[in-house]
Amino acid sequence: MVTLLAKLFIRDHENVTDPGVRQAYGILCGIVGICFNLILFTTKALAGLFSHSIAITADAFNNLSDAASSIITLVGFRMAGQKPDSDHPFGHGRIEYISGLLVSILIVLMGFELVKSSVSKIFHPEVPDYSPVIIGILVFSILVKCYMALYNRSIGSRIGSVAMKATAIDSLSDMIATTVVLIGTIVSAASGIIIDGYCGVLVGMFILYSGFVAAKDTISPLLGQPPEPELVQQINDIVLSYDNVIGIHDLIVHNYGPGRTLISLHAEVPADGNIITLHDTIDTIEHELRRKLNCNAVIHMDPVSTSDPETLSLKAEVSGYLDQIDPKLSMHDFRIVKGPTHTNVIFDIVIPYDYPVSDQEVMDSITKRIQTSHPDFFTVIEVDKAVVQ
């Protein structure tokens, strides 16, 4: 249904990289989610009222909170689509992440309240009144939530929306929660054993779990996280396709919201190359990154010696030392500066964040190996952390 609506109401609906199309998908899915959740709330609330079931009533109000979540997501997409201004030169894209976080908080609050009321129901149980109509409503709810989880996950992945992925997780947890309520309903109707309150606790725990998972997924891009490996590979392929670029390092992808990405990196170029030609190459690369990946790029040129035999030999030697210590280690910006009494060997090493050995121990190990072979060489080592894995 959502696919059909997208074809009818979203112009150029296949072009999901276009910010306008992406925003339209978010708004469409938000409206559909509001409608579905209001229908489910109404039917479940009536079913819970007539059956005196706390689990069904709680599940109904969970759907009402889902409708509120869909409204927040819809508003978030609208606000995130605003153009950059003087106060927010990088746009408003991160509002989408904030809306996803608000949805997560609502999910957690609803789960807490449900567990609280269900525990009370365990100690003060009431005999529920079930009927085939009640069971039919629950089955209908499970099918609807399954569909909502599928379309939110599919479109969320397609347009790269953490808010919609959070909604998909919420819908999936709702489906599982309603299934638990249905099982409890059937067991109570068949055996006379009242497990309504216990089912409510299970539903509440599912909701709490889904809320924390969704919060984690929305907080990560707000705090900053590594870029997708596919994007890193695309950047590498584009930059290294130019003959004047020997290598790249210090790649950082700054995410200011979906479709608002800034790339900064260091491009290694021949130290003896023509500066005008090299600068022209860098400009061309920045333009290609912007055109192909829709990312603004800032590239710093790092001159690298490609003709000095001593530098190349020592670089290969140090690279071998790093491989002996751990293949996960790498280096860049390698150069040597000769003086009257000693020679400085200057380079940066890249160490993963979760590396079990301290930075100082790694540097000491490298320095010891170099000075064993070259006693008059001093090392000047800077440590970089592997932002991009």
Map each language-model feature to its residues.
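Peripheral (non-transmembrane) domains and long loops of multi-pass membrane proteins
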Residues: 1-26, 217-389
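Alpha-helical transmembrane cores and adjacent cytosolic helix/loop segments
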Residues: 1-240
